[in-house]
A protein has these predicted regions:
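Short, positively charged and aromatic/hydrophobic N-terminal segments
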Residues: 14, 21-23, 30-36, 40-41
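N-terminal Rossmann-like NAD(P)+-binding subdomain of aldehyde/semialdehyde dehydrogenases
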Residues: 39, 43-162
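Aldehyde/semialdehyde dehydrogenase
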Residues: 48, 78-97, 236-260, 297
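Adenylate-forming
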Residues: 88, 288-289
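Rossmann-like NAD(P) dinucleotide-binding subdomain of oxidoreductase/dehydrogenase enzymes
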Residues: 153-287
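Single conserved hydrophobic/aromatic residue that forms the stacking wall/gate
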Residues: 289-297
Length: 297
């Protein structure tokens, strides 16, 4: 599929206060659009795979080592030591600082990995969106932790019974992050996990090595391996990662791979959250290459 993806890019065009997202052929990274008789926009290709290395530079990590790291993460929850509000907010604040203080470094790493993706678009769509979500979670985590009242059923309601739901963390959440938004889809789920009081183990994409290495370095500098573990490894490591007995597993990627992930997770009865690729809506206008759209959209 990479061959067809390389021929296309997403362009965000703003005209008359309206934003159009157009999927269009890529030629020399630049395309001229005649949006009206008075408007000519030279748009730079901002999404693509021109610089993506489809061969991993990472070695595989033995399954026993992955399992040992998971055991360390799980031990805290086995001991019943659940993170409270103060600790959750501290973790979230660290993530906010990581993204905010290193936004330029993230942009440069993503640009280096992708080649054709404009750095400002990466900052907006991948980095700043992560920061916005982390700030939102930091502000709201206290209210999310509050117990919720429920009405007890008959006959307990006649006996003065009261019912409440107290939300508890799963324990250790596994996160499999794809290549297309390597910051948002790795740190974003980590924000979720931390806000809910979980620890996490993240498998980063081997296809964006500079960004993945930066994420790993920053996480290691700010968190202990009893809070979060970042894994960079080749294909077999990704396969072994899905075989680990997590308390919950988050996967973002293709439907075909998701079937394999689901199959492995089912062997350990691991609940899943899947965000899967699918249809990509396209706006076709009069000057669009319709035959190309029919083939690739």
């Amino acid at each position: 599929h990479l061959g067809s993806i390389r021929q296309y890019c997403f362009l965000f065009l703003t005209l008359q206060r309206r934003t159009y997202i157009i999927n269009t052929p890529l030629k020399d990274n630049k395309i001229v659009y005649f949006l009206s008789n008075k408007h000519i926009i030279l748009a730079e290709a901002i999404m693509g795979l021109g610089g993506i290395n489809t061969e991993s530079i990472y070695a595989d990590i033995p399954f026993e080592e992955l399992s040992s790291k998971l055991d360390i993460l799980k031990q805290r929850y086995i001991d019943g030591n659940i993170p409270g509000l103060a600790e959750r907010k501290e973790r979230l604040k660290k993530l906010i600082d990581i993204v905010e203080d290193n936004s330029d470094a993230f942009g440069e790493a993503i640009q280096s990995d992708f080649g054709t993706r404009h750095q400002q678009i990466s900052l907006l769509a991948d980095v700043r969106s992560t920061l916005s979500f982390a700030n939102y979670s930091y502000k709201n985590v206290s209210s999310w932790m509050q117990p919720e009242k429920r009405s007890p059923n008959f006959p307990l309601n006649l006996l003065g019974a009261k019912a409440r739901v107290h939300y508890q963390p799963y324990g250790v959440v596994g996160i499999i992050s794809p290549w297309n938004f390597p910051v948002n889809l790795s740190i974003g789920p980590l924000v979720d996990a931390f806000a809910a009081g979980n620890a996490a183990m993240i498998k980063l994409s081997e296809f964006v090595p500079r960004t993945s290495q930066l994420v790993e370095n920053l996480i290691k500098e700010n968190f202990s391996e009893s809070e979060v573990v970042v894994i960079n490894g080749a294909m077999q490591t990704s396969i072994d990662f899905t075989k680990l007995p997590f308390d919950h597993l988050i996967y973002t990627g293709s439907t075909d791979i998701a079937k394999k992930v689901s199959s492995e997770a089912a062997k350990n009865l691991v609940p899943l959250t899947l965000e899967l690729g699918g249809k990509s809506p396209t706006i076709a206008v009069s000057y669009t290459h319709l035959r190309a759209h029919e083939t690739h959209s």
